[in-house]
From Swiss-Prot:
Sequence repeats lie at residues 340-349, 350-359, 360-369, 370-379. Residues 378-390 have a biased composition (Polar residues). It comes from Xenopus laevis. The lineage of its organism: Eukaryota, Metazoa, Chordata, Craniata, Vertebrata. Residues 326-396 are annotated as: Disordered. It comes from the Eukaryota. The keyword Repeat applies. This is Protein NDRG1-A.
Length: 396
């Protein structure tokens, strides 16, 4: 196996920390960005490593959605001021799906693009060749699926997952038919747009939608995008299931934060995914006034939620929380907890579970009657529902 590397040095344009008492400005160290083309058993994958990995912390590993690359998907989030604090504590490894990076050449005729399972199996090679100990995944759409498959197959490599717009299910036959039609060049941008944005967003935020449409048309290799789209739409069901004591269920072993906008085209899929995961390790965050691009539309809320999540993993205990106020959430209660107390939020404070809302009220389930959040599982009787752990649901 070989890796090609290009070093690019850049410094922050302004100081991010200031010691006001001494009048001394503490500048962040210059970050070194290294681009690698890493050869794996399933082909070459392009990665961009930002910062130097720390031995006692995981590396944030990102994976983008179809029609995007790591820059168009995550730059708006990582360039946001509140994310700089996280960038100081963690190195970041951006993974571009094969052929999706800027300036990628078209695949030759007859090229067999990796399946979604094979894309996930490229990641252990990336982790090993870069000398990373463990990672914390941040993925959206197709990237969220790939990271989840990676975590299911290699749980020892993944400490946590932040999954935006995750769909754990295989595509239906209608979507399969749409994939066939997407072979026509003119249909591909529309198909990708319908995946990224809801109908409401297309009408309410036409400038943003048009920006990404132009990116798909002019800034990324459409032939390569088509391969990635077909691979995603041919994905298998992840077959995850909510664990039951005494059984060996297929589920994530690490903490997971599921994120979705309340008008996202993926909202139903994310709720279904939440219903299949371990409620003691999973938090569902629904963002109001947000569609399929929370990292672009609501970067402040997403950055704040990210901080809470990494605090729950034991990192950044002194991180500043300035954008959102926390409030109690009734959905965090767990009648089956060993200590009998209410379940805690994913922080090191030991305080009662809080949602990331600004009104300070208890978080309500997303139902019309405003009752407490229910676990999204099918139950055979009322008693089993009452005795099962409740998933934490948060609105912001």
């Amino acid at each position: 196996m070989s890796a090609e590397m290009t070093d690019l040095n850049f410094a922050e344009g302004r100081p991010l920390m200031t010691d006001k008492e001494d009048g001394i400005t503490v500048l962040l160290q210059e970050y070194v960005t290294q681009e690698h083309d890493i050869e794996t058993a399933h082909g070459i994958v392009h990665v961009t490593m930002c910062g130097t990995p720390k031995l006692n912390r995981p590396v944030i590993l990102t994976y983008h959605d179809i029609g995007l690359n790591h820059k168009t998907c995550f730059n708006s989030l990582f360039n946001f001021e509140d994310m700089h604090e996280i960038s100081q504590h963690f190195s970041v490894c951006h993974v571009d799906a094969p052929g999706q990076q800027e300036g990628a050449a078209s695949f030759p005729a007859g090229y067999m693009y990796p399946s979604m399972d094979q894309l996930a199996e490229m990641l252990p090679g990336v982790v090993q060749q870069l000398g990373l100990r463990t990672v914390m995944g941040l993925g959206i759409g197709a990237g969220a699926y790939i990271l989840t498959r990676f975590a299911l197959n290699h749980p020892s490599m993944v400490e946590g997952l932040v999954l935006i717009n995750i769909n754990p299910c295989a595509e239906g036959w209608m979507d399969w038919a749409a994939t066939k039609i997407s072979g026509w060049t003119n249909a591909l941008p529309d198909m990708v747009i319908s995946h990224l944005f809801s109908k409401d967003e297309v009408h309410s935020n036409p400038e943003l939608v048009e920006t990404y449409r132009q990116h798909i048309l002019h800034d990324i290799n459409q032939n390569n995008v088509q391969h990635f789209v077909k691979s995603y739409n041919s994905r298998r069901d992840l077959e995850i299931e909510r664990p039951i004591p005494g059984t060996n269920a297929v589920t994530l072993k690490c903490p997971a934060l599921l994120v979705v906008g309340d008008s996202s085209p993926a909202v139903d899929a994310v709720v279904e995914c939440n219903s299949k995961l371990d409620p003691t390790k999973t938090t569902l965050l629904k963002m109001s006034d947000c569609g399929g691009f929370p990292q672009v539309i609501q970067p402040a809320k997403l950055a704040e939620a990210f901080k809470y999540f990494v605090q729950g993993m034991g990192y950044m205990p002194a991180a500043s929380m300035t954008r959102l106020m926390r409030s109690r959430t009734g959905s965090a209660a767990s009648s089956s907890s060993q200590d009998g107390n209410r379940s805690r939020s994913h922080t090191n404070e030991g305080s009662r579970s809080r949602s990331h809302t600004g009104d300070g009220n208890r978080s309500r389930a997303h139902t019309g009657d405003g009752n407490r959040s229910r676990s999204h599982t099918d139950t055979n009787n009322i008693n089993s529902d009452q005795n099962s752990p409740k998933s934490m649901e948060v609105s912001c």
